[in-house]
Design a protein with these regions (language model features):
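Short, acidic/small-residue loops that bind anionic groups at enzyme active sites
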Residues: 2-4, 59-75
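A generic local secondary-structure boundary/capping motif
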Residues: 25-34, 46-50, 102-106, 146-151, ...
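Short helix/loop capping segments that flank catalytic or ligand/cofactor-binding pockets
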Residues: 40, 46-49, 60, 67-70, ...
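A gly/proline- and charged-residue-enriched helix-loop-helix capping module
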Residues: 68-91
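Membrane-embedded hairpin module used as a gating/binding unit in multi-pass transport
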Residues: 83-166
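An acidic, phosphate/nucleotide-engaging active-site surface
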Residues: 1-52
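C-terminal catalytic subdomain
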Residues: 169-192
Length: 192
């Protein structure tokens, strides 16, 4: 059987505990009660969680809205009006409180296995990460970094960037996926 997770029906989600950052973890009751949980998906760079895949199958994947909201607000600065927290950024898995919180929530469920695809620019399989839910995912992030990362000799004064057109730039959030990497390549005061 295939089920759609309902993040808003608290009768279908159960409390497992709290993360180190105070996020109350409510997950889909069916997953919590399952004999085995296998995480599936794909690993891609992610604006705030560093990379997609792995623990994101649990949070936000099968988490209640309260859990998701508590986690996602960590992408913002602690200062009102401060914008995005610079430690929650693209391709960063260490000291990234959004990602760390997702890992804490996933550890409470403790999935038995992970299978995540890594795709190439044409949408074909490039590699598969499989094994322990954290270790295999982390190795997959290294593969994605080698496959998609670009080393710059120096920061630039100007960067030209494009999301690639619709649907990759259909709203501000999607458009940021082109803006953020360009901003990472700029000198202080540089122009996109």
């Amino acid at each position: 059987k295939i089920y759609d997770h309902d993040a808003y029906d608290m009768d279908k989600n159960v409390y497992l505990g709290t993360t180190r950052r105070g996020t109350p973890v409510y997950l889909d009751k069916r997953a919590v009660e399952a004999d085995k949980v296998i995480l599936t998906g794909g690993i891609t760079p992610h604006l705030f969680a560093g990379f997609g895949g792995g623990r994101k199958s649990v949070l936000p994947g099968i988490a209640a809205a309260e859990t998701i909201n508590h986690n996602h607000v960590m992408a913002l600065s602690d200062t009102i009006g401060g914008g995005i927290n610079p430690d929650t950024c693209l391709a960063k898995t260490w000291d990234n409180r959004v990602s760390d919180d997702m890992c804490d929530a996933t550890a409470l469920l403790n999935p038995c296995f992970l299978v995540n695809a890594i795709m190439d620019a044409d949408g074909d399989f490039y590699a598969v990460a499989a094994g322990h839910w954290y270790e295999a995912w982390l190795e997959g992030t290294r593969i994605v970094t080698k496959q998609q990362g670009v080393k710059a000799k120096a920061k630039a004064d100007i960067a030209i960037s494009s999301g690639g057109g619709f649907p990759r730039d259909m709203n501000l959030y999607q458009g940021m996926k082109a803006y953020v990497p360009a901003a990472m390549a700029l000198k202080e005061g540089g122009v996109i």
